[in-house]
UniProtKB/Swiss-Prot annotation:
Family, as annotated: Belongs to the YbaB/EbfC family.
Keywords: Cytoplasm, DNA-binding
Family annotation (PANTHER family): NUCLEOID-ASSOCIATED PROTEIN YBAB
Protein purpose: Binds to DNA and alters its conformation. May be involved in regulation of gene expression, nucleoid organization and DNA protection.
Cell compartment(s), UniProt: Cytoplasm, Nucleoid
Name of the protein this chain belongs to: Nucleoid-associated protein HD_0326
Keyword Cytoplasm: yes
One GO term describing the cellular component: cytosol
Keyword Cytoplasm: yes
Summary of subunit composition and partner proteins: Homodimer.
Pfam families, alphabetized: YbaB_DNA_bd (PF02575)
SUPFAM superfamilies: YbaB-like (SSF82607)
């Protein structure tokens, strides 16, 4: 079924990929991504693990409607999460290149 040394090579490749994925996940968790809303008046910075690191609200918004500011913070956070997920997909693609994964399968499992 497997050629000479095929199973051993397959296991070795799987182990190497697992190590690369672990390293990449650690790197991603350390990255910071900033999302914005309100033309940059609200900025939310999160790390690769989606933990909020910093929120910046332009002073001009402090006089505005509280609900609008809350909506802008939520929108900036959602933008930051989207950017973090896009960055994670990009980084993980380098680890999984050459692998034939089913459509929609997310790594890590």
């Amino acid at each position: 079924m497997f050629g000479k040394g095929g199973l051993g090579n397959l296991m070795k490749q799987a182990q190497q990929m697992q190590e690369r994925m672990q390293k990449m996940q650690e790197e991603i968790a350390q990255l910071e991504v900033t999302g914005e809303s309100g033309a940059g008046l609200v900025k939310v910075t999160i790390n690769g693990a989606h933990n909020c690191r910093r929120i910046e609200i332009d002073a001009s918004l402090m006089e505005d409607d509280k609900e609008m500011v809350e909506d802008l913070v939520a929108a900036a956070f959602n933008d930051a999460v989207r950017r973090a997920e896009d960055l994670q997909k990009e980084k993980m693609a380098s680890v999984t290149s050459g692998m034939q994964l089913p459509p929609g399968m997310k790594l890590p499992f």
